[in-house]
Design a protein with these regions (language model features):
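Active-site-adjacent alpha-helix immediately C-terminal to a catalytic or transition-state-stabilizing loop
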Residues: 103-168
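Well-ordered alpha-helical segments embedded in enzymatic catalytic cores
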Residues: 41-44, 101-105
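Short, solvent-exposed aromatic-acidic interface loops
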Residues: 172-182
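Active-site-proximal alpha-helix that buttresses catalytic centers in soluble enzyme cores
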Residues: 1-94, 126, 132-139, 147-156, ...
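Short, surface-exposed amphipathic charged segments that create phosphate/polyanion-binding patches used
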Residues: 94-101
Length: 182
């Protein structure tokens, strides 16, 4: 409670479920869907995410991210907000803009006092982790935000417990979220 746990808000970083391989997919990367195994992963993960009761769902507009949160969106009747700056291409072109878009989600989460789930791609997650490590209240927390790829396995999430301080947002705890069975 000393760190402000009673006032902490949750922000869930979700890595999309297993997608079709880039090699075998003939369409655009933005339209690359999740596999049947990925659909099972997403279904199982969404049951775990529901335990955090995310009332705001945000996602890269790319299909595999949307498909990962789709069941949760349908079951909770909550819309998904598409954030263009969180696509792989947008991050590759303008990583600072991607961080600002993600940082805005942190601000909205703290201001609205609602749990947010954000589905993103591996390289984008790595870039966000680079910034998030600096927001961690303790070094041991920062170490949980892995500094090398793949950062997180597909179809898993990290729950960040964030408080608002006079110096800005501070991450006071991190929990890994992964389905037991899929």
């Amino acid at each position: 409670m000393q760190e402000g746990g009673a006032t902490a808000q949750n922000l869930l970083i979700v890595r999309h479920a297993k997608a079709e391989s880039r090699k075998s997919w003939k369409g655009t990367d933005a339209n690359r869907p999740i596999t049947p195994k990925g659909a099972a992963m997403a279904f199982a993960l969404n049951r775990e995410l529901a335990c955090f009761n995310p009332t705001r769902l945000a996602t890269s507009p790319w299909l595999r991210c949307q498909e990962t949160l789709q069941v949760l969106s349908w079951q909770t009747e909550r819309p998904m907000e598409h954030i263009n700056a969180l696509t792989e291409d947008a991050f590759a072109e303008h990583p600072a803009v991607s961080w600002l878009a993600f940082r805005e989600q942190i601000t909205q989460t703290l201001n609205s006092r609602e749990t947010t789930a954000i589905c993103m791609h591996r390289p984008v997650i790595g870039g966000m982790y680079d910034h998030l490590r600096g927001l961690c209240a303790r070094k041991q927390l920062a170490k949980q935000l892995i500094a090398k790829s793949p950062y997180m396995p597909t179809g898993t999430a990290m729950s960040l417990f964030i408080i608002d301080t006079p110096q800005g947002p501070s991450i006071i705890d991190i929990q890994k979220v992964s389905p037991i069975v899929y």
